[in-house]
């Protein structure tokens, strides 16, 4: 049972994303960067899941039979493609406004997704278990990272995979993800990120290890301004992803 006095919810973060929830599905709006790098992270997720679960990536529903949790799902930008690939998906977000937007868009798209306005710790207390857990661009927004990782670790099945995408705590990430993206290019609303919440990969790996999880792959996601594209990279100074599984 998770300590009821602790919470992963940072109310200022919830308020911030609630104010701009209607923008989730506008590719030219406030979530434009997510729309731009979504194909890159989706390709990586699909590749690794198919490899781990011995699925044919060219089949119509390679994720059939897999139960996926997208925690901090926002408007459902990852939930919808996961369902289209055949998975059973629960999308969870602490912001009710995000969940309402996600539900409406899923209905309009004819997709069945179990969206819930809840937190990782509440889901963990219910004993939920998943084949895949997506912690994408959420770690840097929670109030208690230790509790968040502990809660999500409890929900991962023995042979499951966890994907984590977040921002490194470097001067480069401060300059690009905050000064550049929020204040100069205006890609994101001011205040979207708090540099103090960024985690270095080694810090996150240590936290994962204390929860009996290990990193089996890692990569950076970098932006190319020449063709306005995001690509996989060895450069993890700003955006990076970790692929995680249980210690055997």
From Swiss-Prot:
- Keywords carried by this UniProt record: Methyltransferase, S-adenosyl-L-methionine, Transferase, Ubiquinone biosynthesis
Stored InterPro entries: SAM-dependent_MTases_sf, UbiG_MeTrfase
Top-level enzyme category: transferase
Methyltransferase as UniProt keyword: yes
**Residues that coordinate or bind S-adenosyl-L-methionine:** 41, 72, 93, 136
Q: Which GO terms describe its biological process?
A: methylation
The reaction(s) this protein catalyses:
a 3-demethylubiquinol + S-adenosyl-L-methionine = a ubiquinol + S-adenosyl-L-homocysteine + H(+); a 3-(all-trans-polyprenyl)benzene-1,2-diol + S-adenosyl-L-methionine = a 2-methoxy-6-(all-trans-polyprenyl)phenol + S-adenosyl-L-homocysteine + H(+)
Molecular function (GO) terms for this protein are: 2-polyprenyl-6-hydroxyphenol methylase activity; 3-demethylubiquinol 3-O-methyltransferase activity; polyprenyldihydroxybenzoate methyltransferase activity
Q: In which pathway does it act?
A: Cofactor biosynthesis; ubiquinone biosynthesis
User: What is the E.C. number?
Assistant: 2.1.1.222, 2.1.1.64
Pfam families this protein is in?
Methyltransf_23 (PF13489)
Q: Quote the SUPFAM superfamilies the UniProt record gives.
A: S-adenosyl-L-methionine-dependent methyltransferases
* NCBIfam families according to UniProt: UbiG
Give a short account of what the protein does: O-methyltransferase that catalyzes the 2 O-methylation steps in the ubiquinone biosynthetic pathway.
Stated family? Belongs to the methyltransferase superfamily. UbiG/COQ3 family.
Full protein name:
Ubiquinone biosynthesis O-methyltransferase
| Source organism (scientific name) | Bartonella bacilliformis (strain ATCC 35685 / KC583 / Herrer 020/F12,63)
């Amino acid at each position: 049972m998770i300590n009821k006095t602790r919470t992963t919810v940072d109310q200022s973060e919830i308020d911030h994303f609630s104010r701009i929830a209607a923008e989730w599905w506008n590719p030219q709006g406030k979530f434009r960067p997510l729309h731009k790098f979504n194909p890159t992270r989706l390709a990586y997720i699909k590749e690794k899941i198919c490899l781990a679960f011995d699925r044919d990536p060219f089949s119509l529903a390679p994720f059939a039979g897999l139960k996926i949790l997208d925690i901090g799902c926002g408007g459902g930008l990852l939930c919808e493609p996961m369902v289209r690939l055949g998975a059973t998906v629960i999308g969870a977000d602490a912001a009710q406004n995000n969940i309402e937007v996600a539900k409406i868009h899923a209905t309009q798209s004819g997709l069945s997704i179990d969206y819930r306005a809840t937190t990782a710790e509440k889901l963990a207390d219910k004993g939920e278990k998943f084949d895949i857990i997506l912690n994408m661009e959420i770690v840097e927004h929670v109030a208690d990272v230790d509790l968040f990782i502990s809660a999500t670790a409890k929900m991962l099945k023995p042979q499951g995979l966890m994907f984590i995408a977040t921002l490194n705590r470097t001067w480069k990430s401060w300059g690009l993800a905050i000064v550049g993206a929020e204040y100069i290019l205006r890609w994101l609303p001011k205040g979207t990120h708090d540099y103090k919440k960024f985690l270095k990969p080694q810090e996150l790996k240590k936290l994962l290890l204390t929860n009996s999880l290990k990193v089996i792959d890692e990569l950076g996601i970098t932006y190319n301004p020449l063709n306005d594209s995001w690509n996989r990279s060895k450069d993890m100074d700003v955006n990076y992803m970790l692929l995680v599984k249980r210690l055997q």
